[in-house]
Every structure is written in C-alpha cells, then in structure tokens.
Amino acid sequence: MYAAKMDYGFPVRTPPPPDYPAVPVADAYAPEPFAPEFSARRQAFMEHVLRNPAPANLKAPFHEMARLAAGGMPHHGIFYAALDYIDERKDCADFVLHAVLRLLLQFADRLDAALLDRARQTVLGFKFWPDEAGLDSMCTWTENHQILFASAAFLAGQMYPDEVFPNSGHTGRDKMAIHRPRIQRWLDLRFRTGFSEWLSNVYYDEDLTALVNLIDFCQDGEICQRAAVVVDLLLLDVALNSFKGVFGCSHGRSYEAQKKWAATEDMADTQKLLFGRGQFSLQDSMSAVCLALSERYRMPRVLYEIANDLDRAEMVNRQRLGIRLDEAERWGLGFEDLEDGMVYLSLEAYAHPRTINLFARMLDAFDWWENEFFVPFGARRGLLSGARRLGLLPLVARLFERDITRNTREEVHTYTYRTPDYMLSSAQD
C-alpha cells in the first residue's frame, strides 16, 4: 500500500524556561483504580504534566497549555512552533489548531500581546476546508479530521465574527453558517451509526479534542448539547471495550506502535484520567488535557463504574458501527453532492464502485491531484479522467474492487468478551 511521505517535524527554535523538566519521569501503571474521584485523578494528571517535558511531537502545545493551567511556566517556544506548524499547513495542523483555539479562549489573559497577535493572524489565515484556496497535503476528509476542521472553523468564526478570513473571503459569521451543518451532520451520524473509525485507540483522542472544545466554547446550545451526548457515547465505547487501562479491542483504525505497546495509545492518558487505571504516558495525547481543563463537561459516573466492572465472571459486548454503502440512501446520502462525498471519504471509500465517480470529481474540485496522500491517483490522472468521461470508472472499480477498496470501512459488527483476567475482541462482517 502507498504510504504518504509527510513532514510532521515540530522544530522549537527557542530554549525552555529555567527549571523546565529536562527528562521524562515515568508514571506508575495502575492496574486498579488509583482514585475514585475525578478531582483527585485530575490533580494527579496535572502534577504529572508539571514533572515532565512536553513530548517532542505536535501534541506538545496541549501539554504546555496544561502546564500553564497548573501554575507552571510554559515553554513559549512550543506555542510559537505550533503557530509555525499551522501556518505551513502541514498535515495534522488541525490537531495543533485546537490547542491554539483553547489557549486563546481559555487562557488569553495569561498570554503576552505579541503571542496573542501572532495567534490571531494564524487563526484568520488558516485553510479550514478543502474548497478554500491553496495547495497543501493536509488530510481533511477522514472521520476525525472532518470534525476537527469543521469545529475549528466554527469556533474561529465565533471568535472573530466580523473579521474577514483572507484565505476564503468569508467573515466569521459566514464561517459559522457554513460549518454548522457539517458539525450537525457529523454529530447526527455518530449518534445514529457510531464511528467508522470504530473503537480507535488513536482517533477517539482526536474526536474528543474537537468535541470537548465545542462543549466548552461553542455558544450554540444545540451543538453543545449534542456534542456532549456523542462524547458520552464515545466514552461508553471505551468503557465497554477496555481492560485495566488498555483500550485493547478491535480498532477501525490504529497503528503498529499503538497495537504493540499500550502506553503509546493516544487514549492512554485519557483512560487513567477518567477511569483511574493505566498510565499517564504524555506521549501522544490531546484529549486528556482538554478533559482535565474542561469547565463544562463531566463524564457520567456510570461510565466510570462500567469501565471498572471487572469482577463479574464474564461480560459480552456486541456493537454495530458504521454504514453500508448499499444503504446510503437510508442515511440521506446520494452520489452527486460533494458534501455527501466527504461522508464517504470518512469511510475511506475512495475507489468503491458506488463512489469512484464522485471521488474523481472531488479530486478536481479540491485540487487534490497533487495532495501527497493521493499521489497514486495523480500518477494516473489521465487514465482516470478518460475513464470517467467514458462512464467506465464504476466498471473498472468493480473489476478490481477486492484490491482497491481494501481500506474501505463499511458496517462492522464488533464482539468483545471480558473477564476478570483477560479480554478478547474481534471485528466481524
């Protein structure tokens, strides 16, 4: 399979402040809940942040924001590195942007004027959706990225309602009006169908970051309420499919490292913060910081009890997640509209016989032929465009469906079996 060659480098150009932690201090693994109350778990997490340097990756600004909230001296060079990363429109800039938005919305009174002005310019200048100007290789279309981009656009528009965002020409109010339906549709599909990136020990972290930022800062009460419901449902997924702090079930999307070593799971810190088991790793987490700093979301106590209900002899959890492409109409989806196309791409249905014509149109509409993720399609642009003009793309896709749709995630049925001593999990067609 083609692997995009992306630059996720996060260079920090200034030294840390005096007395900044030099080396990581490992957290102790807790096989049993180490504190029954969230306030105590939150305090332990914040103390762990203060003892440790930020990770050397693009999640670093979240940890420095937590350090600031905990009364420590943050590494301001990391905040400026975050702004550089966003300005360069590197892949996952939307992750970093959510740290900047929370920083501005929750801690602006603790930032100097120069950093505030630079952050404002970065937010106003960002490319919030693939139909806006500029060539880049940001992934905007997977399930987690869609809510990250749409929620960031809405919150940015809310912050600067009368400002013009120069990359699109939209005012902030325009941004809110454009992205509100996208947020609502995403929330509706998660509530009705669950996640295409089901039970992901990587991407649930990203989903939570966007959703908790909406809950905390969005002034639209309906969006806040619906986002909180989806967070509850997502955390129910985690509670039902985890074992002693490890989100060790079947995953719709994950990576080798996170499968081999639970401490590298993006959800590791969130598990220990919310459920009391596991380990604070500070390696690749955003949502733990957002949940620890949230002033408006508190997880229902019953989810803590479910996650820690390991005394019964056995527990079986069966779930259905996602949609079937042959039932697209059931979910209000067609095969002409680019907005529907974004829903299909959240399933990674690029070259499916039912979606390939629409996907080819999206490559044109969004100038995606040069996007690093779509290099294999760009190399065959002439062939694909010709086949599309002749109406042959669906036929070609059908002939090679087994090979070219292997990443597509349609409806899945998961089965998790948990006992006091072990947990097994599988995904079934």
Which residues make up each language-model segment?
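Extended polysaccharide-engagement surfaces of secreted carbohydrate-active enzymes
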Residues: Q225-D429
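Aromatic-lined, polymer-binding surfaces characteristic
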Residues: Q43-C218
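Non-membrane alpha-helical secondary structure
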Residues: F34, F38, C92, L111, ...
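Short low-complexity stretches enriched in small and charged residues
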Residues: P16-Y20, L111-A114, F165-H170, E372-L383
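A compositional/structural signature marking long, glycine- and acidic/polar-rich segments
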Residues: D162-F280
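Low-complexity, Ser/Thr/Pro/Gly-enriched N-terminal "stalk/linker" regions
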Residues: Y2-G77
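Exposed alpha-helical structural elements
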Residues: A99, A114, R118, R182, ...
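Extended hydrophobic/Leu-rich segments
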Residues: M1-V12, F34, F38, F45, ...
